[in-house]
């Protein structure tokens, strides 16, 4: 595991020192103009046995003990070179040593360099046996990478493993600019351990010290080391001034943590954000615990709440052990429904409507797998608190292929549903689904014939409250048995497009599927986990109209579709278009009176869907999709986008997305009842742009307009200045942050963010536009 955020003072000698410079080409090349390179042949291995070469205008001495060289003195051994006006060479026999100890004192215009560093000063000393070197009151410059500074005394020790600075400084700014620097009474940089120790560390902006620590141990390479990360600040209308100061803790080789005090002025307190990562034999995981001891804004808005403590707990784990055991955790829980409205968090969003808490343990061997899981939901609604959890759920699959010409499978599930309310129905559901397939295929097509049996048993309890308030009654014990038959055929035709586009190839891929499922009245079964599935082009060929098992719609239908693709001479897909429809011979029904279109008795071509993609050129791209459902009497969903993308930092995109209110109600019935902002559906047009506007300036922006409400939905504007030693980013965002039921209007949050990045700390000279675009509440999605 590597923490990818550069440490705040890691420059203190070196992340810069050992970063790979392969970045935003223009700026990176400009920054390297002031950086020296090692232009002599690099000597590998132990250089102590190599001869010492000395050139000078004059020489005198007492051979073999002492010698004095004056006038343009130049001493070389291996990769090391020492130059000075005068050099005194001393050679002494050391007891018990086969070789004499050779040292030099250098005076006047001392210059030492090797393949890693250049040291300059008025006075120097070196041990030619050990490569220990001292330079007093001088400057240093890293070779081949940004990094320079000054010190009263600069020392190279341990055959260049250690660089030690007494009263030293460091900056990655080029010569002539000291915009920022780090100074310390002593700095020890260990190249092997990739760590720097700094005593009495002060971080300076220009001549002004803004940060002090009596001792810091900081990472200066790829090895994980504890230390402060780059702080951040912003201003929002929700929390006013906010400031972050993260600290990275390298606990062990297989675990680390990031602890971030997050001050929020309006909340009147500090939120402690704690991220913990780990690796184990059972897999990898991440935990996040955020805790705000008290919140004065929440106290004012919820005077009847006993506690104003706000918190979030997130746990994600995925792993395999002994090649057969699978462990997965996806758990998010917050203190209250307003949490994601009040606080930005990468582990959840107010637009999700709920948080999931899921644990699962699986076992898998050849032809067999089984999973035991529990799943709960925390609904972010103060009006509708009803939600079902699976406590527990068992899923079992057994496969046996090549049974003669057939493939077989048996799927089984047992689950117990519990509601958060005491008066709602609960159930135990047992489902068995044996399947047999006859797959046939050749080079140009395939046909798959499938038959299965859907057998489900429900044992429902706690029905009194529901049955007393509804005309359709639920039964305690229900058995539902449904056969299913399906034939799915595909063909692929190809042709060369030599006449229109030499080297290009076009495919035509027709597909047809017949599906039959008889009708079973399911009105005596409560809907515990079923919802309408999205009917995009690929969704037209699903077996089920609904997810889950509580609603299995009858089907006597033919689905037809065709896809055409165009590939260039490098086999890159340049264009595709897909169009399909479902033709119903009889009405698709479940018997649920709450599904409004089941009363329409519609047949014929009811559902249409189409998708398209066109890579017009290397820089232009177009995507689109539309789904029409006559049962909803309108277009269910549609989306489109066109994009010009020159490179990562130069792009312009126009997009549109639409979802009808009937479609939202059908797919998210429980969320729809409380989501006032979506009662009229979604119809939003948007624009996203990122472009450098000057030599080192770039701008990024996004704007979304709700055509139903005739008002802005979301917007963002960011400006960044980049130089060789720092970058400044200022951003503004206005985003939808909930709905005021009393005033019946949307609630917006305005945020101003400010961030400074010290350059030369990592290999990234990019403008950061992708990060800014994807952090938006409606994140940028690539069209190309």
UniProtKB/Swiss-Prot annotation:
Identify one Gene Ontology CC term for this UniProt entry: cell outer membrane
Q: Where this protein primarily resides, as one coarse class?
A: membrane
Give one GO biological process term. Gram-negative-bacterium-type cell outer membrane assembly
Q: List the disulfide bonds.
A: 31-724, 173-725
Out of the domains of life, which is the source? Answer: Bacteria
Signal peptide (residue range): 1-24
Keywords per UniProt: Cell outer membrane, Disulfide bond, Membrane, Signal
Q: Which Gene3D superfamilies match?
A: Lipopolysaccharide (LPS) transport protein A like domain (2.60.450.10)
- Post-translational note: Contains two intramolecular disulfide bonds.
Protein family per UniProt: Belongs to the LptD family.
Q: How does it assemble?
A: Component of the lipopolysaccharide transport and assembly complex. Interacts with LptE and LptA.
The role this protein plays is: Together with LptE, is involved in the assembly of lipopolysaccharide (LPS) at the surface of the outer membrane.
What name appears for this protein in its UniProt entry?
LPS-assembly protein LptD
Phylogenetic classification of the source organism: Bacteria, Pseudomonadati, Pseudomonadota, Gammaproteobacteria, Enterobacterales
């Amino acid at each position: 595991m590597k923490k990818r955020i550069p440490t705040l003072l890691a420059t203190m000698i070196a992340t810069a020192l050992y970063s790979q410079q392969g970045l935003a080409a223009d700026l990176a090349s400009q920054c390297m103009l002031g950086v020296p390179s090692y232009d002599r042949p690099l000597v590998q291995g132990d250089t102590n046995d190599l001869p010492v070469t000395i050139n000078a205008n004059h020489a005198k001495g007492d051979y073999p003990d002492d010698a004095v060289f004056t006038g343009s003195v130049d001493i070389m051994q291996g990769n090391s070179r020492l130059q000075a006006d005068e050099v005194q060479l001393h050679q002494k026999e050391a007891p018990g040593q086969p070789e004499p100890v050779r040292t030099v004192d250098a005076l006047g215009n001392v210059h030492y360099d090797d393949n890693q560093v250049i040291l300059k000063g008025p006075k120097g000393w070196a041990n030619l046996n050990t490569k220990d070197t001292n330079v007093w009151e001088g400057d240093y410059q890293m070779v081949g990478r940004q990094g320079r500074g000054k010190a009263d005394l600069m020392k190279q020790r341990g055959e260049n493993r250690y660089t030690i600075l007494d009263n030293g400084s460091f900056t990655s700014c080029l010569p002539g600019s000291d915009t920022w620097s780090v100074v310390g009474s002593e700095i020890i940089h260990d190249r092997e351990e990739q760590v720097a120790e700094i005593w009495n560390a002060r971080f300076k902006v220009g001549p002004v010290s803004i940060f002090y620590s009596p001792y810091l141990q900081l990472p200066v390479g790829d090895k994980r080391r504890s230390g402060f990360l780059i702080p951040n600040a912003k201003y929002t209308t929700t929390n006013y001034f906010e400031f972050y100061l993260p600290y990275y803790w390298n606990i062990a080789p297989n675990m680390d943590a990031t602890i971030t005090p997050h001050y929020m002025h309006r909340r009147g307190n500090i939120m402690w954000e704690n991220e913990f990562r780990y690796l184990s034999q059972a897999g990898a995981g991440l935990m996040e615990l955020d805790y705000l001891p008290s919140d004065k804004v929440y106290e004012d808005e919820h005077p009847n709440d006993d506690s104003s403590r706000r918190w979030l707990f997130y746990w994600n784990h995925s792993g395999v052990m002994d090649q057969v055991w699978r462990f997965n955790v996806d758990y998010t829980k917050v203190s209250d429904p307003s949490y994601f409205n009040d606080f930005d968090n990468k582990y959840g969003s107010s637009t999700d409507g709920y948080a999931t808490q899921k644990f699962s343990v699986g076992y898998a061997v050849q032809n067999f797998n089984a999973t035991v899981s529990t799943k709960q939901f925390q609904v972010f609604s103060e009006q509708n608190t009803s939600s079902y959890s699976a406590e527990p759920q068992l899923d079992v699959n057994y496969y046996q292929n090549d049974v003669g010409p057939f493939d077989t499978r048996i799927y089984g599930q047992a689950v117990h549903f519990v509601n958060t309310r005491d008066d709602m129905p609960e159930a135990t559901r047992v489902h068995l689904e044996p399947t047999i397939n006859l797959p046939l295929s050749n080079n140009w097509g395939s046909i798959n014939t499938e038959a299965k049996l859907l057998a489900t048993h429900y044992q429902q309890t706690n029905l009194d409250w529901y049955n007393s308030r509804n005309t359709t009654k639920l039964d305690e014990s229900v058995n539902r048995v449904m056969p299913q038959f399906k034939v799915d055929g595909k063909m692929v035709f190809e042709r060369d497009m030599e006449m229109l586009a030499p080297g290009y190839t076009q495919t035509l891929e027709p597909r047809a599927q017949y599906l039959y499922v008889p009708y079973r009245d399911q009105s005596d079964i409560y809907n515990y986990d079923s919802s309408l599935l999205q009917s995009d082009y690929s969704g037209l060929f699903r077996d089920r109209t609904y997810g889950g098992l509580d609603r299995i719609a009858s089907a006597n239908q033919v689905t037809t579709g065709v896809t055409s693709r165009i590939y260039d001479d490098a086999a890159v897909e340049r264009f595709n278009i897909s169009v399909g429809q479902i033709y119903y011979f009889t009405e698709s029904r479940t018997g649920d009176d709450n599904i409004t279109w089941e009363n329409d008795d519609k047949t014929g071509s009811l559902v249409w869907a189409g998708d398209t993609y066109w890579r017009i050129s290397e820089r232009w791209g177009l995507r689109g999709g539309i789904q029409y459902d006559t049962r909803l009497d309108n277009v269910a969903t549609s989306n489109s986008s066109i994009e010009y993308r020159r490179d990562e930092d130069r792009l312009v995109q126009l997009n549109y997305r639409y979802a009808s209110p009937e479609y939202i109600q059908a797919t998210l019935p429980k969320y729809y009842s409380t989501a006032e902002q979506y009662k009229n559906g979604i119809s939003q047009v948007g624009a996203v742009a990122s472009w450098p506007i000057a030599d080192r300036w770039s701008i990024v922006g996004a704007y979304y307009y709700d055509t139903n409400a005739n008002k802005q939905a979301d917007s963002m504007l960011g400006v960044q200045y980049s130089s060789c030693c720092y970058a400044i980013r200022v951003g503004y965002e206005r985003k939808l942050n909930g709905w005021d039921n009393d005033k019946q209007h949307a609630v917006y949050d305005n945020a101003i963010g400010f961030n400074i990045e010290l350059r030369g700390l990592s290999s990234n000279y990019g403008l950061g536009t992708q990060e800014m675009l994807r952090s938006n509440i409606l994140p940028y999605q690539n069209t190309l």
